[in-house]
């Protein structure tokens, strides 16, 4: 989530890469496709975007900034164990690409300390993927709009802890 009411140009650029990567991976999350193939698609989009921004030179360098996997099963546990071969109908998985650029990275400092990750829950069906969290704003414009709205918790006051604990 954007911590202010708008993204900086650098945050916006990185967010768009992650968003594009996720959109492509969601569309590729078809029964019969492999977890590996959708990860590779996502990784390639992130690597290409980072190259276009001049953050990396070689696509293999993207791993520094996209150091995690793309997906896991959701079931009885949030990170349910399971077969990570081919996707099958009725599986529920996450698709969550991300980019993290720590301070002192070998790129322009304007990119430092930016972290973007977008996670959605996807139901695999024989007719195609269904995004179970599609009702939440996901693109940067939708998030900026949401961040400018008044919070539903604006006047909410948390009770004092010592009143709750006896």
Regions found by a protein language model. Give the residues of each.
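Active-site neighborhoods and metal-handling regions in enzymes and metal-associated proteins
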Residues: 3-166
């Amino acid at each position: 989530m954007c911590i202010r009411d708008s993204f900086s140009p650098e945050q916006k650029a990185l967010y768009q890469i992650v968003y594009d990567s996720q959109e492509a991976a969601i569309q590729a999350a078809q029964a019969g496709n492999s977890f590996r193939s959708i990860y590779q698609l996502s990784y390639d989009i992130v690597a290409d975007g980072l190259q276009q921004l001049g953050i990396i030179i070689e696509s293999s360098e993207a791993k520094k900034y996209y150091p995690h996997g793309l997906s896991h099963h959701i079931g009885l546990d949030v990170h349910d164990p399971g077969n990570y071969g081919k996707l099958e109908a009725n599986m529920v998985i996450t698709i969550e690409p991300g980019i993290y650029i720590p301070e002192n990275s070998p790129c322009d400092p304007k990119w430092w300390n930016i972290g973007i990750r977008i996670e959605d829950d996807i139901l695999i069906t024989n007719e195609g993927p269904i995004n179970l969290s599609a009702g939440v704003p996901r693109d940067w414009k939708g998030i900026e709009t949401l961040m400018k709205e008044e919070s539903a918790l604006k006047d909410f006051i948390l009770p004092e802890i010592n009143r709750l604990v006896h």
